[in-house]
């Protein structure tokens, strides 16, 4: 028999690791955008993206750019590759976060 609490914490750990991978990939994408597409880099607030004074609407602009797959028309294949990877990581992290919330709710009901 397995412990549901241990399973929950293992799932939380996997979710946190995937979030760290996602943010690391986002940093790599921003550094590539700085060199290959400075206009896009400025429009998504590249310098202030991970700061406390970052502009949320510009950060959401990058998320929409990736989720709507507008990067497919980009001239740099490295940007296309990184955006596709980032999109898949976002879907995975969102799914895992939803699963953690569902597990937490079910544990609260169960116990």
From Swiss-Prot:
It is a multi-pass membrane protein. InterPro entries: Universal_stress_protein_B. The chain crosses the membrane at residues 1-21, 90-110. Pfam families: UspB (PF10625). It is found in: Cell inner membrane. The keyword Transmembrane applies. GO terms for cellular component: plasma membrane. The keyword Cytoplasm does not apply. Keywords: Cell inner membrane, Cell membrane, Membrane, Transmembrane, Transmembrane helix. Belongs to the universal stress protein B family. This is Universal stress protein B.
């Amino acid at each position: 028999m397995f412990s549901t609490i241990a399973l929950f914490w293992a799932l939380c750990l996997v979710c946190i690791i995937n979030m760290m991978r996602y943010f690391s990939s986002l940093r790599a994408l921003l550094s590539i955008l700085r060199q290959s597409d400075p206009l896009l880099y400025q429009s998504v607030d590249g310098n202030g993206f991970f700061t406390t004074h970052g502009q949320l609407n510009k950060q959401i602009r990058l998320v929409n750019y990736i989720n709507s797959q507008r990067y497919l028309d980009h001239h740099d294949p490295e940007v296309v590759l990184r955006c596709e990877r980032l999109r898949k990581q976002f879907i995975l992290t969102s799914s895992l976060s939803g699963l953690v919330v569902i597990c937490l709710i079910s544990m609260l009901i169960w116990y």
